[in-house]
Each structure stands twice: as C-alpha cells, then as structure tokens.
Amino acid sequence: MTSPLKRTLTRELPQHEGQTVKLQGFVHARRDLGGVQFLVLRDVTGVTQCVGSGLTLPLAESSVEVVGKVKAHPKAPGGFEVQVEDFRVISAATEATPVEIPKMEWNVNPETMLDYRVVTVRGLKERAALKVQAELVDAFRAHLRGEGFTEISTPKIVSAGAEGGANLFPIDYFGHPAYLAQSPQLYKQIMVGVFERVFEVAAVYRAEEHATSRHLNEYLSLDVEMGFIEDEEDVMGLENRLLASIMERLRATSQAEFELLGATIPDVPAHIPRITLMDARQLVTEKYGHPVGGKDLDPEAERLLSQHFAETEGSDFVFVTKYPRAARPFYAHPELNEDGSVNGEVTRGFDLLFRGIEITSGGQRIHDYGMLMDSIAAYKLKPESLEGYTEVFKYGMPPHGGFAIGAERLTAKLLGIANVRYARAFPRDRHRLTP
C-alpha cells in the first residue's frame, strides 16, 4: 500500500534529519548481509543508502518505495542514510541488467554499450552528460530571449538542401521527392524578415558516411540568426556573450555533474581570440611542422591551433575567420575590397574552435538579391529549386548573419567524452538505427 507521505528526493534528505520520509526510485545497488540488508536507491537527484532488516530485495533497477527515518551517516552517499521502516516494490525487474549500472567504468565493447543504451543510459555518468546538455540548451534559450530573440520552428521535411543538395537523406513524400533537413538555414534567414532575431533548437540530418568520434548523422543543432548587423564581428560578439552566459549557468547548476565526470567548466574570454584561416594555416605549419592543404583546417590542425591559443592566451576558444568561398555555401557573404567591390575568393564566414575541435560555423549572409542570384549561378545551382527562399530577398532583407552550435560536440568537449555518440541519448551514425 502506498504511504500517504509526500515523496522526498534524495537531495532533500539533509532538510529532514530525524524525520520519517518516503523515497521512490530505482534499486541502484544492493547487499544482503544476513540479518541486515543494504539498498542504494537512485532517483533523479542522486543516490542514498537505505538500511533495513528482514527485507526481500528485488533485482537491480527495480523501482521501489522506501519509508524510513533519516539519519546522518558520514560514510553514506551524501552523508545521510534512511533506516527502513516500510519497503514496497513498485515494479520489479524481471532479469539482471546486461551491465552493472553502479559501475563508474564499464569494461565492455563501446558498441555493446550502445546496443544496450536503453539500460546503460541510466548510469550516473551517462545521465550526468545528458543533464549537462539539458542545462546547456536551457541556458542557450534563456540568454537569447534576454537579447530579444524569438524561438522559431522550421520544417524538417524539405524539397531542397540548404547547402547545395549534398549530404541529404531522400524520402518519399506522397510520391514526390523530398529530404530530411540538413539545416534550418534558409528558413532562419527568411524569419529574420519577421522577428529580426531568431533561434531554433532542433535535430538536423546529414547523410555523411563518416565513422569518426566527432560526427553524427542526426544531431541537435542550436541555430541563431540576427538582422541589422554591420558585419560578422557582430555575430561573433553575440556568440561570445552567449557562451559566457552558458558557462555561468553551468557553474550554478551542474558542478556536481562536472565533478562526477572529472571535467572543468572553461572560462570564456571577454574577447575570444581571432585568427584568419590563412594565418592559422601558416602558424600551424611553421610552429608545429604540420602542413595544411585543402580549403579548411584538418582535425590535427584544429587541435594544434587550439593548443597554441591555450598556451599563449589561456583561451580554450578561438575564432578562425575569413574562410574561402570554396569552403562556404552559396549564401555566405563575400568579403569586400577596399573600393567596395566583391572579393570573389574570401567570405565573412568563421568557425569557432573549442578545445581542439570545431563546434560552430557561422558568418554574415548575403542579403542583396542581385548578389545572391549571382552567387547561386557561380555555385552552379538551379535557381528554380530555391525560389521559395530567394523570393524574400526582393523585399528589403537587412544585413544579417548567424551561426549553429552542435550540442553534442559542445557537450562532449566540455565533459571530456571521447566520442560524440555518448553525448546523445540515442545516437544515429552510419551503422546504427537502434535503439
């Protein structure tokens, strides 16, 4: 029979010393020493030790109810234990878990961990990572609302890609070809004409056949777009403030999770260092002997560049600016020459590196209709496939720009998680559709 007492959470026990409380949660661990039974109960706020006699303990992960008196105990988790007066099994586990949830480190194949993700995600470290991400996303929303942004929701079934048609998942839309959205980019820009400052928190889909520790085919994208800017510096300034606000929130809400995972919350400089892509390539080549080819920085170059700024400026963050046109999509605003003419080689695009990995791409976008149509032609795209997007630029779009942060990448780097898949509850990569 359910106790009439109101439920108490484990984190509230210090407020109830000497009182009788009701706890509800999961059997995290158990020991039977003959006449005395020890039960570690886990709820959403933590774990606590419960001690009783004559108890028949169910299998681990069973959900249970404990009624008992709170007593200070220096060796118990959290410094308190509950002396059991009444015990009830709410829902019994029917078989042993494939891994021992209480273990802080599991010596099993990483793929096995994901195969049994519905259970392993209950682990304290796994739960902590997702809790940090939830706080991060909430802080993202709160800061942007404070700066006058409006949250929007854009289609995830689209007729064309935001980045030229590559890396799209095709679907059959009632007999018509369609795709899963790889980015809300085009809709974000359209909505600048409505709310001026917008953001979205939503999944995006990339049909990229990567098998790396930094890529997912479905991930949570934190997207921002703002109008009436001067140039990309306004956008980088916003992201600088946003990240500082997020870290401040994490210090207030998530210290326990960071301590559990052995991670530290970074300081965000008042002015995150900037370096142009060309200078970054030269620095990495000359200082570290790592030649950089292609149109972007490779992963090792990102790591070395981050190392340089951590050592020389004490910053875990660095903006890499002035990306070449070949490395940016058609809507990236070109740099202008001193005479005001268009520089056909360089854009006002940037990336943000954090602890050795890119977590953001952003920049100023083209807002002039003629320039946009010229860019679409230069990229050899079909104008008719983008008419729903380009139409709005006939009607006074302001200078605007924005960025997107990959929530899982940021979470993984914050917490020292080696593979981005473990920063998502149920990851999707090129080999995984379940659970």
Swiss-Prot record:
An example of a Gene Ontology cellular component annotation for this protein is:
cytosol
Effect on the protein upon substituting P77K: Enhances enzyme specificity for tRNA(Asp) over tRNA(Asn), by decreasing the ability to form Asp-tRNA(Asn) and increasing the efficiency of Asp-tRNA(Asp) synthesis in vitro. Seems not to be able to charge tRNA(Asn) in vivo
Q: Which UniProt keywords apply?
A: Aminoacyl-tRNA synthetase, ATP-binding, Cytoplasm, Ligase, Nucleotide-binding, Protein biosynthesis
**One GO biological process from the UniProt record?**
aspartyl-tRNA aminoacylation
Q: Which GO terms describe its molecular function?
A: aspartate-tRNA ligase activity; aspartate-tRNA(Asn) ligase activity; ATP binding; RNA binding
Summarize where L-aspartate binds, as residue positions.
E163, R206, S361, R365
InterPro entries found in the cross-reference section = Aa-tRNA-synt_II, aa-tRNA-synth_II, aa-tRNA-synth_II/BPL/LPL, Asp-tRNA_synthase_2, Asp/Asn-tRNA-synth_IIb, NA-bd_OB-fold, NA-bd_OB_tRNA
Specify the domain of life of the species encoding this protein.
Answer: Bacteria
Sites annotated Important for tRNA non-discrimination = P77
Amino-acid positions noted as binding ATP in the UniProt annotation, renumbered to this chain: R206, A207, E208, R214, H215, L216, E358, G406, A407, E408, R409
EC number(s) per entry: 6.1.1.23
In terms of Gene3D superfamilies, this protein maps to: Bira Bifunctional Protein, Domain 2, Nucleic acid-binding proteins
Under catalytic activity, the entry for this protein gives: tRNA(Asx) + L-aspartate + ATP = L-aspartyl-tRNA(Asx) + AMP + diphosphate
Enzyme class, first EC level, given as a word: ligase
Task: Quote the subcellular location field of this record.
Answer: Cytoplasm
Q: Which family does it belong to?
A: Belongs to the class-II aminoacyl-tRNA synthetase family. Type 2 subfamily.
Kindly state the subunit structure of this protein.
Homodimer.
Q: Which NCBIfam families match?
A: aspS_nondisc (TIGR00458), PRK05159.1 (NF003483)
What is the designated name of this protein?
A: Aspartate--tRNA(Asp/Asn) ligase
Organism (species): Deinococcus radiodurans (strain ATCC 13939 / DSM 20539 / JCM 16871 / CCUG 27074 / LMG 4051 / NBRC 15346 / NCIMB 9279 / VKM B-1422 / R1)
